[in-house]
Amino acid sequence: MVEEIGRTAEGDIIINVGPQHPATHGVLHLVITINGETIKKVEPHLGYIHRSIEKMCESLSYRQFIYVTSRMDYLSSHINNHACALCVERGLQVEIPARAQVIRVLMDELTRIASHELWWGAMAMDLGAFTPFFHAFRERESINDIMEETCGARLTMNYIVPGGVMQDIHPNFQTRVKNFITLYKSKVSEYEELVTGNIIFQNRMKGVGYLSADDAVSYGCTGPTARGSGVSCDIRKLYPYEIYAQLEFDEILETGSDSFARYIVRIKEMNQSIRIIEQLIDAIPAGDFQAKTKAVLKLPKGEFYQRVETARGEFGVYIVSEGGTTPYRIKFRSPGFSNLSALDHMARGSKLGDLVAMMGTLDLVIPDIDR
């Protein structure tokens, strides 16, 4: 998993980390130059699970390609599907029923919490704390049960279709969501007790992986990675889609610019997602859950772009249409690729043992980066 592969003329050691390593949470290969325990350079090598997803999508219909994106950032699969559907709907100029919009946003925020829960448990486990992982999965399983009851799947939901959602919510949906909110609020104090307020955890995180606001912008970082450096970049606030402009919630910003600041952003974001869900769960309007669209969709000739806020940052979908039933060109803008590009800058001068903490706060999902 970690091996020496050479030395530089200055005597620095070059080592491999991965591509099979538990800290990468996927197939990620890092070539690291170290002087003693001090990192001098981190060079990510990608391509181990490249699947030509963008090219694959160009041979699929506008209904089919949406679900391929579930296999990219699989922890934000619903939000990825949402972005694709919005981009297609922009081209079709379809008006989405109010009921479908509310359901979509509710599912987005549940997905965001589920993703952050997994990150929180894995982040703590990477630093040697095993107990929080089981606490995180307790809450996450409640969300997965809601997802399964609503659309039949627990991870890659494929619930969104152009024009709305695949089917209406389960009769128990609102009750199950309210029960989850009650559970989460009763357990969130444990997060502070187990991890956030733990002095050992703080010592491992504070001052580690510094990334200034200017550097975050230069590297194209988005999501909690950038907001931990004080950069305002929440797409739900800056470029509202669906009904986000009508909702009351805060964009979480921290100015610490280190691993602990990025950690705090994600913890507080879960509370904001709960706040959004509470505003909507008793306000789901009656009506259709899907607009009437043709079975075979044709986008007019042109270029269309849509961005959304996933659990990891800005996810963008760019479609070039020649007026046919399949895209002429599709390009995805994934948050993980830009966030990973900042790892070398963050790590230089740090100790090798701190690399795990830095990578953990980037919340990398490798299929999102290497697609």
Identify the residue ranges that each predicted region occupies:
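Active-site bordering "gate/hinge" segments
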Residues: 1-29, 33-329, 333-371
